[in-house]
């Protein structure tokens, strides 16, 4: 055997050497093999029987009897012993096993379309395909290929029994050429029924191929993926065979014995062998015969398929090898100066095909295609060859002065007279190295094409000789000239050549220009905005420079200050203290004030001037413009706010504290000596108080007229602004005093110049005129001051207001008021309307006539018309249009046909019934006037009634006073109460009290806000959704919105639809009041439709897409969202989350898992997927040995494959090969069949199967426990309840709308009804709160129990997962360290084949602890775990149902209470609105009754109408009900008591902490007893203190713990009260405050508890310290015994000892008491926890409360008004 193996290796080496020789002689190719070998995981089938569960299938046999059926179970890989019924796709790979026909691949029953796909890792050359079927061959199929890893597919060939039917568009028959796609019927017949083959040859040998390397042929024979699509099964017709129809599909399926895909590694003729691809296992891990995909390239080629040349082998183009032409790649020729090159086809063609390699990165200063010439700046050494590394010498030329930057002559040429290394100078350069400028030139430069430049000095700016610096070229310039050529002026000068010194100064304005720099050409300075002129001293058109007094603040617009000035005196009997006095200009006299006029200020009063328009931080002088009315001086006190300074301003004295100044009576302006500093963007206020220091009787009524307050900027506060000379001129000419005066001003030139400059500086330019377009003549204004040219009677700097005594500013100016001197109170009128202030009975714009109803201007009197006329002649007083049937100048008598005395107040009444007897409208027998009552009594005819027979009887209408209008029945379309005498007018027939929401003269129309048919009594309220209609369509106050009176359709906002405008249109969502809906904006490519969820805007995404707009890939999908999202093809059990890369789709395997789909265990791990435990440590050793052997065998297999076609050349070896084959077969038989029969493992296998079934059942039960599948039903129920609540909410909205339109009587009734409902609901909620809290605590306890049981179940599951039976021998080896396939005696423990004393097999019991015993124990544990989990499942489900029921009921109760609270609030608001309407109605009635000239019959009618109003309940009861509601709404205030109580408890805990610290301090004193004997006397005192402290400490601890418990209870109560308060009121701020207080109380309670624990800890420390005290006392006693103390001292010491021992005993007793208290507290906690057991009793109460609340809610929903 060893000899044969050596022979194999020797022959393999010979074959390899021969293959290398073949590559040297021409084209060479790798051997062809089966591409399926070693690619089990890359072979996939779309359908396999029994993958998810065992599946029955039948075969066509026993035609006369019952058909024969079998089971397919492919959940585990095929194993001849354990899994013989597994028919996965990897069974079709040829393995040369003896019993080959016992395994095959089989599809699911009855499927026509099934595909098999092979995914290769690289591009392979495909030869042919052979399929061997177990069943009938397919009736139709096709074979496809892909060369781009499955992105695009091409068909190889179609196969079908009936090509015309299966593939109608495909040509059938023989192919006419290579690669023709045809349909072949040769391999699709029904015979044979088994063992039939389908063969596909890529290149038909019947066709001659001229160029096998053409792109067409190469594309035909290469592939990366192969797909076989079965499209139709052969069916034989069950009716003919008498089969049952219900299982006819069980016998039709695809079954395949073998699949051979012959091919080789594709290497373009440049390799004879291949190796595994990168990132794949090498030969040591590959099965024998596997065809690898990475070429081992020859001929200087490279790449996976040898598709390119190696680096530096680029001299010729790459070509595939063909026959004897190897077309090897040639190396480049670079003269030893480069190791890199590339191929250039243009160079190759230009050389005639000799050389195409271009060298890269030439070294040694060389360049060129072959690095055969020197680089620029170098030249060739004639004494050295070009391949010499020092052949190129650098040039010695100045690069700045030579042509081409220092390049010299590269080589000598006698013909041209050039010498190698010679420099080539530029035109203006000279020298051997070209490093000098020629005369009268300068500046040798590399950028200058001439090398040097001529001097070129400007004659206007330079001295009269043309020379310059050789290096810089600088010419010699005049005084104010600069530049290299003296061609420009220096900064601050302009006009080259126009001045003796070369240039003129700029002279820019110091304020109008930014600097003193100007244009050197024209001298234009850089002006600030809106400033013009060469020197920037003129404003632009429409702009001006502000004067000194520009910042004026009118006293009339200032705020009056309340109170007296600090330095002023009181003023009595004068009010108000400040009064505005308008100044009226006198023609011909100058105006001495600004603004409308003055502010008349009394002594002690003040004015506040608001200053917020400061443009620049600067010091200002305050100027006050005033006029005194007496010879006495006044005093002002000034306060500036805010007073603080900043980086720009330093606080002045005036700004730091109030200052007083005198206002002389002889002047009209006062400039305060102390300046103030103001800056921009600050709101200042300047308070000015006025007073008279010497106020006597003669000045009691004195006052001062204040015009304005001005701020004058100080020029000296501007830094670096002007020179000292300018400041001197400014002060010399008194610029400030002149510019501050009122009236026309004539400024000196120096003042005007400096003021203009300062204005431009402060305002950063000129200020806009802003002349009023109607009040001014034009848009321009004065250069300094900005005064616009005003039209007549128009004043103001901008001409924007009328002068005093005029009005109506327009294009014509203003009009004078012309108020009548007798009719008006003043000569000044309103400046907008022109209305003069008239006296009481005077009217008219000018107050020049009497009011209506008055006469005799200017002494206007009321018209004397006896109240029967309103108007009279304004001059004579004669009455117009007398009423009441009166006549005369003063309406003092009755007209003809009436009687009465108007002068005495008796109205005129007709003595008619109703007309006079001579007319046709007389409906009485007679008429008379009662002398006592003065009543006119008519005796009416039949059919008429009334005092004057002027009315129809009840049930009739008409107007007897009009001819032809008899009384008729009221026609109101059945929409009135016919028994009501006031339901319609008996005179006109007009319907007055329409019912059923109707209106109109005949009740024929629906009311506004209603729709339907009034004739059919179907008028209904418009149900428009308030958010979906335009607010213009809904009346204010909550009334019904308008809708179509017939259909009820509401006017919807944009993109809103529905009859009630209650939903968004398709493709829109988010209904917003007043704006409508917004677009869904769903991605049309990835969403199912353009519609989206109307609440969330979520678009309905297609499968695989997510995001709100479906613009993202869904989790567990990958790809490009705009293009395509592909599901991750990964095994979830073997992946992490997310399971694949979102961009590439590559599966993310967890540790220990591998495979493209993460569906198998990685090498080095057990193959029990998905657990994949790491193998034993010995695995690595064996794996190395097996890999070495596998590699050797694989080499032999390749050798055998190469020698397969050369068997005829080695006849002498045929016998040896035959012997070797026999030996190999024998070895395979021995390896596959163990030394003992398989029947010995049957009993073990049965236990294995039983345990596995138990594990599967337990897994299913655990899934049920963990997943709570019935939660889905709970969620569905919750959704249904939410839908019902939504419907109820809509009903409540409709109810609210009806309530808002109800009458006061209905609202009162509803308030009473809803109050009872809300009171009942509030009571139920209060009762429910404790139940809900108890339920929540119980639910938490149950969840704790559930977690405990779950952890136990997880532990059982983990134990079960450890029970695995991969293989009997491997399992025994892992358990006992030995495979167990030998007798039991030498083993450390019993194996799988243990025997007893009598030789019988023993597989359990003592001494046999192998896999069988382990399986038996595992089965027993699994059964126990199964029972535990079943009980756990029942308990968990019962508890979960109870928790969900209670939770749902509590949630429903909470929601119902919230709804009731909201309804009650709405009704309360409605009642308030109705109350306001009633008050308004009562006010109107009172005003009506108080009016004069109201007829008595109208008053009587109104009184009767008011008396007819009846409330449903007495007013006192209604008031009581409203008071109760208000009391309930104020319940939140009661929580303040709880807050105070908790604060007191916290204070008590803090005091207790102080006492505990005092006790600690007292205990520390005891520690110093060892210092002196005298301190022992303090022990007794300390003992007393300690006793009292511990006693108090114990009591305080008990009290604190009680307080803690009480605080916790109050906290829980406050939480429930907070929830109740939140239901009663919508005041979110109040709730937030209460929650903050609650959190503070909780913190206090926690702190108190912590302090109590700290006090207990201190008591324990006190005990320890006392023990230490005893020790120190003992030490001290020993010391005293040695020193010999006196008897007295020893007695005192003994007393102290006894006292200390007593103190210790007392301390220990108190510690025990504290311990007992702690135990009691724990017992109380346990008792509180036990109360949770009352949940079962409370459940019934919660259900009853819920039902009652639901019933009340239903009753409330039916309470429509």
From Swiss-Prot:
Q: Where is this region: Domain alpha?
A: 1376-1408
Q: Where is the Laminin N-terminal domain?
A: 24-264
Q: Which residues are glycosylated?
A: 169, 229, 246, 1016, 1055, 1223, 1301, 1326, 1333, 1354, 1469, 1517, 1587, 1596, 1609, 1725
Q: Name one GO cellular component term.
A: extracellular region
Instruction: Name the UniProt key words of this record, in alphabetical order.
Output: Basement membrane, Cell adhesion, Coiled coil, Disulfide bond, Extracellular matrix, Glycoprotein, Laminin EGF-like domain, Repeat, Secreted, Signal
Q: Which organism is it from?
A: Homo sapiens
Q: Where is the Laminin IV type B domain?
A: 545-763
Q: What is this protein's record name?
A: Laminin subunit beta-4
